[in-house]
Amino acid sequence: MRVKIVSKPTSQLNNIIEKIKNISTKLGFEVVDKDFDYVIAVGGDGTLLRAVKQNKPVIAVKAGRRGLLMDVPVDKFEEALLRLKKGDYEEEEYMLLEMIYNDKVELGFNEVGILYDRPEAIKVGISFDTERVSVEGDGVLVSTPQGSSGWGMSATNSLLYKDLSAIEIIFVNPIFYYLRSVVIPPKPLTLRLEDKGYPQTARAVVDGEVVTLIKTNQEITVRVSQRKAKILRFFKLDLIGEVLHAYHI
């Protein structure tokens, strides 16, 4: 079996990456950069974001400051690989979002949306089914259940359980609104940068990365992808407990 290791290029991880490579080789795995069967994500949630988009099953090794979805401790990595060879694991599938703009499609694991570009409020129109609403503030994000434990939680203080079939529309620092988010079934929706009487630009973001700038009256479409992110689980993932611990609740 062939594996690819994904991690941040930091000096703090050098020894851990070397250990991961040595164990993989010892157990008969070939470490490669392409034509691989599995991805080994070593780090935290940011590393996982990159790993799941490789379109292969992911082994999530926790070696970062924050890794709510990482279940394999470094000292149990060898045990995890042995169990992989035996087929002794569970495969979890996670929702992915597609952001469509200018005939391009970007894939998101946590969230996609529109955020302000300059230090001023923007007005975002939200459309799905027969609903048409506008929210003024710092922007609007559309989050997967797993994404609600990241950026979404800092904006809403709420959590969607990881295998819930729903998406969360998050209002980022809304003006004059007490409502912080709305949870809806996984259906397509449109986000539009509305006209406030003068030209504005906003950032279209996917998993915290700016993918393009949009102008007044331009829009993006968000829908649930037919693709799923696959993470192989070897140890129990106590998501709610990890969230409480991470935020010192």
UniProtKB/Swiss-Prot annotation:
Binding-site residues, NAD(+): 45-46, 50, 110-111, 138, 149-154
GO terms under biological process: NAD metabolic process; NADP biosynthetic process
Reactions it catalyzes: NAD(+) + ATP = ADP + NADP(+) + H(+)
GO molecular function: ATP binding; metal ion binding; NAD+ kinase activity
InterPro entries for this protein: ATP-NAD_kinase_N, ATP-NAD_kinase_PpnK-typ_C, NAD/diacylglycerol_kinase_sf, NADK
Cofactor(s) named in the record: a divalent metal cation
Active-site residues annotated for this sequence: 45
Alphabetized Pfam families for the sequence: NAD_kinase (PF01513), NAD_kinase_C (PF20143)
Subcellular location, principal: cytoplasm
Compartment annotation: Cytoplasm
Known role: Involved in the regulation of the intracellular balance of NAD and NADP, and is a key enzyme in the biosynthesis of NADP. Catalyzes specifically the phosphorylation on 2'-hydroxyl of the adenosine moiety of NAD to yield NADP.
Matches recorded under PANTHER family: BIFUNCTIONAL NADP PHOSPHATASE_NAD KINASE, NAD KINASE
Family affiliation: Belongs to the NAD kinase family.
Protein name according to UniProt: NAD kinase
Gene behind this protein: nadK
